[in-house]
């Protein structure tokens, strides 16, 4: 995927290795967490600093994928598919699990690429949002991006889950915003996709595994 997207060439020029997560580490959860054990890629756990660089996109299961959802990528292998199954059709349960993983990873910095965002159904369409945002609080960043595209926070399960467990700052009035104000960058025509369940069917898991093998063969 890195080769096909052009990232591999840029990374090689800059001397940056692209790593496939191969080993996971069990992380002890906090008492109020949903599960008894969490697995995160060993490379993430061993890193001195974690910088989270999500692309700002609409999402057909969670409405938006920004800072918190992107950190689900720190879960190695096909464990992500099993976690989808574990959550069933409960979007709030899935949102809470995403928040818990985000808290465990604890990135020191998040930079959200919203220069050319993605909106709409299916594979999505490009949307020239024209913003680049950054911060140290992934909840605050998700909350601000909800405001930018007009998604009420009470309808975004990730923000509600963060509020429930007391992680991050979800109150817009308590978030310090530097640079352009929200009124300067907010839009009213961002298209959200039709929602689908968060659980994966066994058929989808099998087809995903086959697609993963195919991508590895042509990479």
Where are these regions (language model features)?
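N-terminal and secondary-structure boundary signal
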Residues: 1-219
């Amino acid at each position: 995927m890195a080769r096909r997207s052009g990232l591999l060439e840029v990374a090689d020029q800059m001397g940056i290795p692209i790593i496939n997560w191969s080993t996971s580490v069990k992380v002890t959860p906090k008492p109020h967490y949903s599960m008894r054990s969490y697995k995160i890629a060993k490379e993430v756990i061993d890193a001195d600093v974690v910088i989270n660089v999500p692309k700002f996109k609409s999402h057909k299961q969670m409405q938006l994928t920004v800072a918190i959802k992107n950190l689900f990528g720190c879960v190695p292998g096909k464990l992500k598919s099993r976690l989808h199954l574990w959550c069933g059709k409960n979007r709030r349960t899935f949102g809470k699990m995403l928040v818990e993983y985000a808290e465990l990873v604890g990135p020191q910095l998040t930079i959200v690429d919203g220069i050319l965002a993605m909106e709409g159904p299916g594979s999505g369409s490009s949307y020239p949002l024209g913003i680049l945002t950054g911060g140290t609080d992934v909840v605050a960043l998700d909350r601000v991006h909800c405001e930018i595209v007009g998604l009420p926070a009470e309808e975004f399960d990730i923000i509600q889950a963060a509020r429930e467990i007391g992680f991050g700052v979800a109150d817009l009035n308590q978030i310090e915003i530097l640079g352009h104000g929200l009124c300067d960058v907010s839009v009213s025509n961002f298209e959200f996709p039709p929602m689908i369940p968060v659980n994966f069917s066994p058929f989808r898991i099998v087809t995903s595994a086959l697609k993963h093998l195919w991508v590895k063969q042509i990479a």
